[in-house]
Amino acid sequence: MLPGIKIFISLLNSKNGMYIIRSRVFANSIVLRKEQSDPFIFEQIFCEQQYTFGHPAKQDVKWIIDAGANIGLAAVYFSAEYPNARIISIEPDKENFALLQKNTSNYKNVTCINAALWYKEEKLDISNKEEKSAGYMMEPKLSNDVDLIKGITVEQLMKQFSITEISMLKIDIEGSEKELFENNAASWLSKCDCVVTELHDWLKPGTSRVFFKAMAEFDWITYVKGENIICLKNKAAHS
């Protein structure tokens, strides 16, 4: 039985609306909300191992941008899988972000940013607040409301952290990938070794078409695992 499944089964008797996972597998306790999508996401990452795909240069993975970090489960997984990497975890929702900080508190290689990955710098808001927090969608908002969400670009992150090459860009941003990939994506895709994304055509029709059009500008080895499309830059073809 996989370690993730053993841990997941041990959760099932937890109470009080929270699952608290304590295991030597993790650097600190992991908190999941019982009524949100957290247990399902935990199962995807640690039981189904949907982010396990055998990066060809694992020891050389230096920078991971985790867009749509939710409560930090992917960041925790990436920290174990790529111990030499710095991970930038971006999450727009305040409640998710608080748990992201808590769940990664002992992971010194993880930096948490309360923002949304977007194609340009502007203020955003959640357009579907009736949904569970893992399914929030972003929309531009022309307002000075202090509760609005900061939209941040890939280029801004690269400049802020002096990143010259992104080892992995993980994107799970509930439809915002459509705007991201249809607006000059080549400028930063040229600096990505690996893109891992979940597409949401049922939220924004045409998302897949936009994504594959942008990706076609470069040579990728592409395959699917679970809900994710994994694209590895085909460096061997150009060496």
Feature map (PLM): residue ranges:
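Phosphate/nucleotide-binding beta-alpha loop and adjacent structural elements of enzyme active sites
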Residues: 1-239
